[in-house]
Amino acid sequence: MAIVSSVPLASKSCLHKSLISSIHKLKPFCRTIPTLGMSRPGKYVMPSMSMSSPVSDDGVQRRTGGYHSNLWNDDIIQFLSTTYGEPAYRERGERLIDEVKNMFNSISMEDVEFSPLNDLIQRLWIVDSVERLGIDRHFKNEIKSTLDYVYSYWTQKGIGCGIESVVPDLNSTALGLRTLRLHGYPVSAEVLKHFQNQNGQFACSPSETEGEMRSIVNLYRASLIAFPGEKVMEEAEIFSTKYLKEALQKIPVSSLSREIGDVLEQDWHTNLPRLEARNYIDVFGQDTKDTKLYMKTEKLLELAKLEFNIFQSLQKTELDSLLRWWKDSGFHHITFSRHLHVEYYTLASCIAIEPQHSRFRLGFAKACHVITILDDMYDVFGTIDELELFTAQIKRWDPSATDCLPKYMKRMYMILYDMVNEMSREAETAQGRDTLNYARQAWEDFIDSYMQEAKWIATGYLPTFDEYFENGKVSSGHRVAALQPILTMDIPFPHDILKEVDFPSKLNDLASAILRLRGDTRCYKADRARGEEASCISCYMKDNPGATEEDALSHINAVISDVIKGLNWELLNPNSSVPISSKKHVFDVSRALHYGYKYRDGYSVSNIETKSLVMRTLLESVPF
């Protein structure tokens, strides 16, 4: 299993041709968007989710996954705006960038608006604002200087609002802890203990003022960046979660209440920077009454809106390229599988928001889409004989090896072959060395893990948890989804760095583990109903006689929590010899793929939250 759920494969006769799933028309969605279910512009048809066992063209009955059809067709391009690609908007953006840089500099020039009693929180506020609005890439030097200044005043008790503050401040300390830690500064979570009373509760007044609530918001946000063994961060998360949920029941609807709701919804390891920026744009500075602060938020907000919309013109070009690849590769002939290339491109655009990372976005979308097709081929459509043949032939990496394969497998063989070669050429341009054989080995290991699961399905074998989990981390697909796309970036990955972010590194192991664990908690019931027994849940129950599903889920959720903390440490360890910039995109791939499982199996049921993500971050511009 990969980043999708699975159903049992048929293991009888060999089939050489694809099946065609029937599509049933159900109730329409309220929003008009382009889909393959449209019979004419403006008419949306919800695709079918029915299960079936159709007879293929050569008379052999094969299972289908019952997944709904592709939600998007080529008309999606029409919905992407190119208006903000005009030079005038870019020129306005450049002027705003200069003005925001002046905002950073004005703090250091002792502007009358700032004083030694509030300068630390003001500095942290502007750094936090540009990061949450998705515009921080323009201010790397300013952010570094600002955080160096804040860190120079950091103490074992935290910091106050300003350099001359006598008493440490919870809001400043919590925001400082989070921001400094995310930038690799060695700050200890122990500072939070100074804000706890004897009962372990965090000191706050019962008045629930806006300032009080913002302190707890930042305490909650800081608690999510926990490292293994930090009990005070666990206590902070429990306290702040309860406090904020109760506060939402009492305070009136406002930008603050919406921000609190968004923060509680956006847990750290499924947080997508572009989605966060889109949501924060809607609440940033809405209720600001201070005239000078309002002028600052307006500049930041205008720049954030421009950046968001300008990026859409680039997305249109990239998506057009992806759709051509999908069509030219013949994916429309592969009717037994899900087609999620648009969804995967959206996820890529949400984690790699820098314009220069086009090859990463397209490479990630292509790799993930191929993973999905292979998953459905191994779990649903292929027979054991066909799959064993495909597994053996792919290791030859020779187009002539397709002669003995069924027609549908020939197509997939060549798609994989061409994609791996294409991205290897791009990687050689970026990295200055040949990585083709390295990438091929990663794909071979991945396909071997699929073959192992196919054998378990065919024989009805239920492995032990450890046996299943070790194979499942490979079959999660995280490694092959991340490896070649990151190598196409303008970030150097010499061998000594690559081995610290790719297999067999701890970072890769944990990222793969969380995808397998969370994926199984979202998919196991549907998989079991279709006849596939093996999952983390069922294997845990086998190893622990008498354990219930609830026991298994509780255990796995606890493991996931620990894995997230371990991932935080692998990314942010201040003593690591590997820079955060080299690890960040592997970490972000984990976040993107994990997002697909945040609410449900969003890769098999992509017409709810996953569809909403496409609409909000790809198709809809931000209004001015």
Swiss-Prot record:
Keywords: Chloroplast, Lyase, Magnesium, Metal-binding, Plastid, Transit peptide. One of its GO terms (molecular function) is magnesium ion binding. Pathway: Terpene metabolism; oleoresin biosynthesis. Mg(2+) 2 binds at D375, D379. Binds 3 Mg(2+) or Mn(2+) ions per subunit. It is found in: Plastid, Chloroplast. Belongs to the terpene synthase family. Tpsd subfamily. The Asp-Asp-Xaa-Xaa-Asp/Glu (DDXXD/E) motif is important for the catalytic activity, presumably through binding to Mg(2+). This is (-)-beta-phellandrene synthase 2, chloroplastic.
